[in-house]
Amino acid sequence: MTATSVAALFIHGDRSSRPEDTAPTPMLAIQEVEAVEGCGLRQDRRYFTAGDPGRERVRQVSLIDEGTIRRHEAVFGPIPWNTIKAQIVLSGDMHLPNLIGATITFESGAALIITKMRDPCFAMDLIAPGMREAMQGGQQGALARVTASGIITAGMPAAVVPAGAPVQAVR
């Protein structure tokens, strides 16, 4: 188990960036969010209700770690965290795509299973030309599915539990 914490939380606002935009639409910084099993983050515009037919359930929550952001900043300069389209930023440097199948547990009992790496969208090139290509191959974090409901707050302790290991809430 690897200890971490929630460095920042963001939700999608009224709309996401579109190809015709000249700058990425920033996400909204928040201090607390409700993770709902099988649905995602309740306050987010992309929250899925359990009855949404045909929705891919691996994409409920987007994650990135501070180390990944810092590596991109070393190449592209300062990056506003609310423009990289990740809902949860975790402290540390853990390269989340290497942890597919692992579970992130939070002090509140909320839990997310990492399901796949994220593919960067065109909006990354709006932050800095070439950033989208630099984020290929898992350099934009990972996607996760909510497996246990609970409140997640900025600064909250969390843990990454390897795939197959027993999952417990952080104490």
Predicted regions, residues:
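Well-ordered alpha/beta subsegment
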Residues: 142-171
